[in-house]
Amino acid sequence: MNVSHLSFAGTRPRMAAPRLLIFHSHSGPGTETAAKVKSYIERSWAGGDHGVTVPHEHLDVEGPRTQLLPWDRVGISSYRANPFCIGVETADRKGANIEAEPWSEGQLQAMAEICVEFAQRTGYPIERATAW
């Protein structure tokens, strides 16, 4: 895992205890790499846009993990669940058959690693949500 924390990461509120892990997919230009996503977030934040998505981790198209925000800080990725949710954004696989293959093999491997790490840190079992 690469670590490249956002410049304002230390100013985010502390998270008491994560109890939810959620994966989202970025879409649009500039979401292929963590470096591009980080640059966009930094520019937005500096410009006063504090509503921009601030994930804990980003998975590039081929799967390398980059931590943008420590897991003990509150991110902005899950609306009312932000205070207790670890948010992970995955790069959009432009041109791929998203319905049939939403993630690359590298992304799937990184997602599995994150799930195991989350379960080890929190003690929660790895379960797929069946209802909201």
Q: Model regions: which residues?
A:
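Active-site-adjacent loop/helix surface patches within enzyme catalytic domains
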Residues: 1-129
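Short, conserved phosphate-binding/catalytic loop or strand-edge motifs used
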Residues: 132
